[in-house]
Amino acid sequence: METNDRQKSWLKVWGGRLLNMIFFFCMLFVVYLVSGVFIVTSFKIPSDSMEPSLQTGDCILVDKCSKGARLFDVFAALEKKEVKIHRMPGWRKFKRNDVLVFNFPYPGRWDSIAFDVMSYYVKRCIAVPGDTLEIKDCHYRVKGHDGYLGNTAAQDKLQKLLDSEEFVNRGIVVESYPFNKELGWSIAEFGPLYIPAKGSVVEMDSLNRMLYRNLIEWEQKEKLTFKRDTVLLGDSVISRYCFRENYYFVSGDKME
């Protein structure tokens, strides 16, 4: 009888300890999941586009509190379905030169915006909502901002390359968005481009129709079409447009 009592006592003690350990590790796992969704998560740099600041394979910690965590249906996202995203309140706005992790808005094609929320890019913020951005001689410029923007050493290097005899003699011009030969924007001379802020209004002239068509169609889920001098959003005639979201201009640090 005494032996049985000892065995029962031993099982009770170690059974309780085992349950406590299981509970402890379950709580750790829950804390890990919650912190990864709402507070901070790790991200591995997938390419060399941020060199020399960040190297391929580097792991960085992404602060989710500053802008606010995003909540969405993970299972739908894994199936490559379009998901509705709810963003929690944040405590500060993104600033110029911040390093941002985001979803690339053109995963499949260049003429329309879409998002794969399970695929991430990392770039440096050059312009924030409400800024007017230009590129002059390969260097970023924002109206009213006198500080540096991006990796100026890489911009100097790119300018020297494009001004080299080989490029000049061949007449090489590297076009950039919106890839319109009449407009003539390139990676060396670009803009001015207004970066839309939530609530800002633009006139639907020929230039703005070209620059902001993708953004407008993504926000409204309607096609923006042109008939002579008339702009149609779906079946409605519009002469100006009020943006629903804030937008940012980002770039890699490496320019080669």
Show the residue positions of the predicted features.
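Soluble "head" domains of membrane/secretory-pathway proteins
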Residues: 2-16, 51-256
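Hydrophobic membrane-insertion alpha-helices, especially the h-region
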Residues: 19-38
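N-terminal signal-anchor transmembrane helix
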Residues: 42-53
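Cytochrome P450 fold signature focused on the C-terminal beta-domain
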Residues: 41-42, 127
